[in-house]
Amino acid sequence: MVKLLSIGGSDASGGAGIEADLKTFQEYGAFGVATLTAIVTMDPSRNWSHRVHSLEEDCVRDQLETAFAGVGVSAVKSGMLASVHAIECVAEYLERFAVAAYVFDPVMVCKGSGDALHRELNELMIQKLLPRATVVTPNLFETAQIAGISVPRTVDEMKEGARLIHERGASHVFVKGGGRLPGCKHALDVFYDGKTFHLVEDELVQSGWNHGAGCTVSAAITAGLGRGLTAYDAILSAKRFVTTGLRHGFQVNQWVGTGNLSKWRDRFH
């Protein structure tokens, strides 16, 4: 059995974060384990605004100790790391257990909170985790933060961001554009392996029920790597997986909706 570890925030709505990751791992026929670094809630009395409740260092460390015990972990993904101790713990355990496949989803802002994480946390993530990443999966805002450029608005700017991020240490870079580029009629992302740029395109699903799509694609990439796929093939599989889920998306509450991940069955089953 392939064992996968997701490290990140729990989303009380169930659509994103650890909850999305574990659903994704299950769809790939893998056994998912989790380490929570924070819990994200939504307040319906305040227009569904989000709050991030970080967990203490001992709690994070004890979970990592449990997750890595016993049967070896095939691949690891990290998402929301909203504290210095969470970032440092993840870096420590990646090194201690010589993790060969690591997907770094550099969550720098929580949708609905309106606030980016503290700049010093972003810099610490880049310093400690980016050089360890088999694949890093920034969105356009995160690409700008890591690469030190303006938010990309064209494919060429996405490529430049990917190149600069690769220079900072990541083995492979997957810049998630989705449908956010001006005039874009497809869900378009850029993959860079240090030598070649690949455009990864699929249908742009306009339902609006896309909460957790970024978490899901990085989790699916993690599952693909854990299954032995190359980084590029894992990304192609993840793209199909997410698009299929979004086609069958549904409303979770008055604020968000999410993709129906059960509508897709990968060839690994």
UniProtKB/Swiss-Prot annotation:
It catalyses: pyridoxal + ATP = pyridoxal 5'-phosphate + ADP + H(+). The keyword Metal-binding applies. One of its GO terms (cellular component) is cytosol. ATP binds at N139, K176, G177, G178, G179, R180, D189, V205, G214, K239. It holds the Pfam family Phos_pyr_kin. GO terms for biological process: thiamine biosynthetic process. Coiled coil: none annotated. The keyword Iron-sulfur does not apply. GO terms for molecular function: ATP binding; hydroxymethylpyrimidine kinase activity; metal ion binding; phosphomethylpyrimidine kinase activity; pyridoxal kinase activity. Its EC number is 2.7.1.35. InterPro entries: HMP/HMP-P_kinase_dom, PM/HMP-P_kinase-1, Ribokinase-like. Keywords: ATP-binding, Kinase, Magnesium, Metal-binding, Nucleotide-binding, Transferase. Mg(2+) binds at E142. Phosphorylates B6 vitamers; functions in a salvage pathway. Uses pyridoxal, pyridoxine, and pyridoxamine as substrates. Belongs to the ThiD family. PANTHER family: PHOSPHOMETHYLPYRIMIDINE KINASE, PYRIDOXINE KINASE. This is Putative pyridoxine kinase. The lineage of its organism: Bacteria, Pseudomonadati, Spirochaetota, Spirochaetia, Spirochaetales.
